[in-house]
Amino acid sequence: MGKVLIIDDEKQILSLLSRIIGLEGYEVFQAANCKVGIKQLEQNDPEVVLCDVCLPDGSGVELVSELKRLRPLSEVILLTAHGNIPDGVQAIKNGAFDYITKGDDNNKILPLIAKAMEKATVAYSQQKAVGKQYSFDTVIGRSPAIEAVS
Protein backbone atom coordinates (compact mmCIF):
# COMPACT_ATOMS: atom_id res chain seq x y z
CA MET A 1 0.00 0.00 0.00
CA GLY A 2 2.90 2.38 0.59
CA LYS A 3 5.49 3.51 3.11
CA VAL A 4 5.13 6.28 5.68
CA LEU A 5 7.92 7.72 7.83
CA ILE A 6 6.90 9.47 11.05
CA ILE A 7 9.40 11.87 12.64
CA ASP A 8 8.30 12.99 16.11
CA ASP A 9 10.11 13.19 19.45
CA GLU A 10 6.95 12.55 21.49
CA LYS A 11 6.81 8.79 22.06
CA GLN A 12 3.04 8.74 22.61
CA ILE A 13 2.35 10.60 19.36
CA LEU A 14 4.83 8.39 17.49
CA SER A 15 3.22 5.23 18.86
CA LEU A 16 -0.37 6.38 18.26
CA LEU A 17 0.26 7.57 14.70
CA SER A 18 2.24 4.41 13.88
CA ARG A 19 -0.62 2.22 15.08
CA ILE A 20 -3.36 4.19 13.28
CA ILE A 21 -1.42 4.41 10.01
CA GLY A 22 -0.25 0.80 10.21
CA LEU A 23 -3.84 -0.41 10.62
CA GLU A 24 -4.62 1.24 7.27
CA GLY A 25 -2.12 -1.08 5.62
CA TYR A 26 0.84 1.27 5.30
CA GLU A 27 4.36 0.17 6.20
CA VAL A 28 5.45 2.57 8.95
CA PHE A 29 8.94 3.71 9.95
CA GLN A 30 9.75 5.87 12.97
CA ALA A 31 12.33 8.47 13.94
CA ALA A 32 12.59 10.65 17.05
CA ASN A 33 14.81 13.38 15.55
CA CYS A 34 16.03 14.95 12.31
CA LYS A 35 19.22 12.90 12.04
CA VAL A 36 17.46 9.53 12.40
CA GLY A 37 14.65 10.78 10.15
CA ILE A 38 17.08 11.50 7.32
CA LYS A 39 18.69 8.09 7.79
CA GLN A 40 15.27 6.36 7.71
CA LEU A 41 14.32 8.34 4.59
CA GLU A 42 17.47 7.22 2.78
CA GLN A 43 17.15 3.58 3.87
CA ASN A 44 13.41 3.06 3.35
CA ASP A 45 12.41 5.55 0.63
CA PRO A 46 8.90 6.31 1.95
CA GLU A 47 6.35 7.99 -0.28
CA VAL A 48 5.01 10.08 2.63
CA VAL A 49 6.75 11.65 5.62
CA LEU A 50 4.87 12.99 8.66
CA CYS A 51 7.17 15.35 10.53
CA ASP A 52 6.80 17.29 13.76
CA VAL A 53 7.74 20.97 13.57
CA CYS A 54 9.65 21.03 16.89
CA LEU A 55 12.34 18.36 17.07
CA PRO A 56 15.24 18.10 19.53
CA ASP A 57 17.92 18.59 16.88
CA GLY A 58 16.23 21.02 14.52
CA SER A 59 13.12 22.49 12.98
CA GLY A 60 10.76 20.36 10.94
CA VAL A 61 10.06 23.40 8.77
CA GLU A 62 13.75 23.55 7.81
CA LEU A 63 14.00 19.75 7.59
CA VAL A 64 11.43 19.76 4.77
CA SER A 65 14.01 21.29 2.40
CA GLU A 66 16.55 18.55 3.17
CA LEU A 67 13.97 15.77 2.88
CA LYS A 68 12.79 17.12 -0.50
CA ARG A 69 16.39 17.49 -1.69
CA LEU A 70 17.07 13.84 -0.85
CA ARG A 71 13.73 12.46 -2.09
CA PRO A 72 12.02 15.09 -4.26
CA LEU A 73 9.06 12.83 -5.05
CA SER A 74 8.25 12.01 -1.41
CA GLU A 75 5.52 14.15 0.13
CA VAL A 76 6.06 15.76 3.55
CA ILE A 77 3.21 16.64 5.92
CA LEU A 78 4.22 18.81 8.88
CA LEU A 79 2.53 18.38 12.25
CA THR A 80 2.57 21.08 14.90
CA ALA A 81 1.23 21.46 18.41
CA HIS A 82 0.82 25.22 17.97
CA GLY A 83 0.11 26.24 14.40
CA ASN A 84 1.11 29.66 13.22
CA ILE A 85 0.72 31.18 9.79
CA PRO A 86 4.38 32.19 9.14
CA ASP A 87 5.63 28.63 9.86
CA GLY A 88 2.89 27.18 7.68
CA VAL A 89 3.74 29.49 4.80
CA GLN A 90 7.46 28.73 5.11
CA ALA A 91 6.76 24.98 5.26
CA ILE A 92 4.81 25.12 2.00
CA LYS A 93 7.55 27.25 0.39
CA ASN A 94 10.08 24.61 1.48
CA GLY A 95 8.07 21.93 -0.32
CA ALA A 96 5.68 20.55 2.31
CA PHE A 97 2.50 18.91 1.03
CA ASP A 98 0.54 20.27 4.00
CA TYR A 99 0.87 21.74 7.49
CA ILE A 100 -1.62 20.66 10.16
CA THR A 101 -2.15 21.04 13.89
CA LYS A 102 -1.83 17.92 16.06
CA GLY A 103 -5.09 16.86 17.65
CA ASP A 104 -7.00 19.42 15.58
CA ASP A 105 -8.99 16.69 13.92
CA ASN A 106 -7.56 13.20 13.93
CA ASN A 107 -10.02 12.27 11.17
CA LYS A 108 -8.07 14.51 8.78
CA ILE A 109 -4.75 12.68 8.98
CA LEU A 110 -5.63 9.46 7.13
CA PRO A 111 -7.33 11.15 4.14
CA LEU A 112 -4.41 13.59 3.98
CA ILE A 113 -1.91 10.72 3.95
CA ALA A 114 -3.97 9.02 1.22
CA LYS A 115 -3.86 12.20 -0.93
CA ALA A 116 -0.13 12.63 -0.40
CA MET A 117 0.44 8.93 -1.12
CA GLU A 118 -1.54 9.18 -4.36
CA LYS A 119 0.46 12.22 -5.50
CA ALA A 120 3.79 10.58 -4.66
CA THR A 121 2.80 7.28 -6.28
CA VAL A 122 1.83 9.04 -9.51
CA ALA A 123 5.11 10.99 -9.51
CA TYR A 124 7.16 7.82 -8.94
CA SER A 125 5.23 6.02 -11.73
CA GLN A 126 5.83 8.89 -14.14
CA GLN A 127 9.52 8.97 -13.29
CA LYS A 128 9.78 5.23 -13.87
CA ALA A 129 7.95 5.48 -17.22
CA VAL A 130 10.20 8.31 -18.40
CA GLY A 131 13.25 6.36 -17.28
CA LYS A 132 12.20 3.36 -19.38
CA GLN A 133 11.36 5.52 -22.39
CA TYR A 134 14.72 7.27 -22.34
CA SER A 135 16.97 4.47 -21.19
CA PHE A 136 20.28 3.77 -22.94
CA ASP A 137 18.71 0.95 -24.94
CA THR A 138 15.90 3.06 -26.38
CA VAL A 139 17.88 6.24 -27.05
CA ILE A 140 21.15 4.76 -28.33
CA GLY A 141 20.06 1.30 -29.43
CA ARG A 142 21.66 -2.13 -29.31
CA SER A 143 22.96 -2.63 -32.85
CA PRO A 144 26.22 -4.55 -33.33
CA ALA A 145 28.00 -1.28 -34.18
CA ILE A 146 26.83 0.35 -30.93
CA GLU A 147 27.72 -2.78 -28.95
CA ALA A 148 31.25 -2.58 -30.38
CA VAL A 149 31.61 1.07 -29.31
CA SER A 150 30.27 0.60 -25.80
Question: In which residue ranges do the predicted regions lie?
Answer:
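AAA+ ATPase active-site-proximal loops
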Residues: 129-150
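Short amphipathic alpha-helix used as the core "switch/output" element in two-component signaling
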Residues: 39, 61-73, 90
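The feature encodes the CheY-like receiver
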Residues: 14, 56, 84
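Two-component/phosphorelay signaling modules centered on CheY-like receiver
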Residues: 11-29
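Active-site residues of response regulator receiver
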Residues: 8, 52, 80
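Acidic catalytic/metal-coordinating carboxylates
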Residues: 33, 59-62
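Active-site beta3 strand of CheY-like receiver
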Residues: 44-50, 55
